[in-house]
Structure formats: structure tokens, C-alpha cells
Amino acid sequence: MISILGLDGFLQLVGMITIAIFALAFISFILILIISYILLKKNKLIFPSLALFLMDNLYSILLKIFLLIGTEDTFYRVGIEFYNKYYEDRFKKAKKRVLILPHCLRDTKCPAKLTPKGVECIFCNRCRVGEIIKVAEEKGYKVYIVPGSTFLKRILKEEKPEAVFGVACNRDLFYGMNMLSRKGIPSQGQPLLRDGCINTLVDVDELITRLKSL
């Protein structure tokens, strides 16, 4: 073939074939992502162990690929849904659980004080955080209201929970669940409906329902 095409022609042909293979592989990967997302919405996982490895270790690459067909926020939501589905059964079996709530769920005039273990709710009824805490504690959760990820790392070190339920914005929740997954700790997450530094919002009724059912 080299004698027919010449060296330059042969190398050009090899280059074209290589590009075609990579393009086909890339398109196939995109299709797999789309199919996986559709199945995830139907509570089905394909190749769960492989998907977990990719999500845990290659999420930055997955994000770049996902941005070709979606948004960064959508990627985080998909990741959260994946972790929720993947770890649901293990989470239900865990005995020592903690619930992590963001301090931004509080009312702007919240009288509770920040302590070394987070914000200590005084159940003043200015917001629904107290309601969430009561339900969670009845279900055996130890609850923390935290101002940032530093507190989460401290809680993991001191409490050594078997499972963690987190409430946060999509980005923080995804990275938190990703970190927990790499540590082998099953988690569940409830994204905020409205994020920001103050006056954030979560679907309290849905959160309480999940806390009771898990």
C-alpha cells in the first residue's frame, strides 16, 4: 500500500483513519452519556461500577464533555441524581448518619449563635430549619448547621459517620458527594431551590419526606 500511495499519502490515510476512529469514539461516548441520563431519570443505572469510577475520578473531563451538550449546573444535577441512586441502598443500611444543613437556610434575623460545631438552632420558628431538625433527629440523624466545607471535614473526622445527607447548592452538593464517595461513605443530597449566601430555599416537604423514607 505504501508503494501505491507513497509515504506521504499513506501517513495521510493513517491520520484520517485515526481521526475518524477518535470522532466515532467521541460521538459514541456522547450518546452513552445521553442514554445514561435518560435511564437515570427512570431510576435505572447502566454499568454502575464503571459510572461510579468515572464520576469519582474523571468528573472534570466529564464536565468538559458535558458542556458540549448541556450546562455546568445541569452536570452537577445529573451527578447528584447519580450519587443519590447509586448509594440509596447502602445509605438505608447505615446506622450512624449525619444531616448537614447550610447556615444560609436560616432567617436573616436568626438569633442562633455560631459554635465550634456549627450554628446551634434554638427553634424560634423564624424559619423551618427547626422543623427539619426535629424530624431528622427522630429518624436518628445527628444534625449540623454549617457555614462552609471546613466544618464538613471536621465533622467527618470527629464523628466518623457511616452515611451523610447533605443540603446545598448544586455545585457544592456535587463536590461534597464526590468527596464522600471517594472516601467510601454513602451519601444522599437535596439541592437548594434557590441558592446564594442568604435567604436560600429548599423544598422542606420533599426533604422531610426523604428523611423519613430513607
From Swiss-Prot:
InterPro entries: DUF116. It is found in: Cell membrane. This is Uncharacterized protein MJ1141. It is a multi-pass membrane protein. The chain crosses the membrane at residues 19-39, 50-70. One of its GO terms (cellular component) is plasma membrane. Keywords: Cell membrane, Membrane, Transmembrane, Transmembrane helix.
